[in-house]
């Protein structure tokens, strides 16, 4: 009697499996055939890292090194230089994408909105050393996500022709000795 009961349970299990497979055969497929059907990631997808320019066409990066410090895997390296008008810029800016985990910490740490993550995800390569991108590979011609932001309008740093407090939307420096009781 126990063997007969086990046979019916096994047959029922087999029929239920066939029924479930049959139902899935006619349902919509979740798998996309990637190269033929393009994948469109969400707008907040963190992909390829780019360096942007401000509205006047100059690069936004001031080589403050905050992105390199914030990076948990240490894949960003740069060196600061200073131009004749007093602006800082990176002499070199290098990201090793073979180590990058695309966490977005560098984008959050950047005070100038120079470093931004785009939804581009097709970055594979055959050689590891080809995944080390230099500044020329990362620098794009546009402002990226933040169209009107210009760090030097808000920073309070002296630039060649403007003193502190003379830039757009910047108040004059406060003399602390004048406000003492």
Curated annotation (Swiss-Prot):
One of its GO terms (biological process) is aerobic respiration. GO terms for molecular function: 4 iron, 4 sulfur cluster binding; iron ion binding; NADH:ubiquinone reductase (non-electrogenic) activity; quinone binding. Belongs to the complex I 23 kDa subunit family. Its cofactor is [4Fe-4S] cluster. [4Fe-4S] cluster 1 binds at residues 61, 64, 67, 110. It comes from the Bacteria. It is found in: Cell inner membrane. NDH-1 shuttles electrons from NADH, via FMN and iron-sulfur (Fe-S) centers, to quinones in the respiratory chain. The immediate electron acceptor for the enzyme in this species is believed to be ubiquinone. Couples the redox reaction to proton translocation (for every two electrons transferred, four hydrogen ions are translocated across the cytoplasmic membrane), and thus conserves the redox energy in a proton gradient. Binds 2 [4Fe-4S] clusters per subunit. Keywords: 4Fe-4S, Cell inner membrane, Cell membrane, Iron, Iron-sulfur, Membrane, Metal-binding, NAD, Quinone, Repeat, Translocase, Ubiquinone. Residues 52-81, 91-120 form the 4Fe-4S ferredoxin-type domain. Its EC number is 7.1.1.-. It is a peripheral membrane protein. Pfam families: Fer4_7. NDH-1 is composed of 13 different subunits. Subunits NuoA, H, J, K, L, M, N constitute the membrane sector of the complex. It catalyses: a quinone + NADH + 5 H(+)(in) = a quinol + NAD(+) + 4 H(+)(out). Gene3D superfamilies: 3.30.70.3270. This is NADH-quinone oxidoreductase subunit I. The gene is nuoI. [4Fe-4S] cluster 2 binds at residues 71, 100, 103, 106. PANTHER family: NADH DEHYDROGENASE [UBIQUINONE] IRON-SULFUR PROTEIN 8, MITOCHONDRIAL, NADH DEHYDROGENASE UBIQUINONE IRON-SULFUR PROTEIN 8, MITOCHONDRIAL.
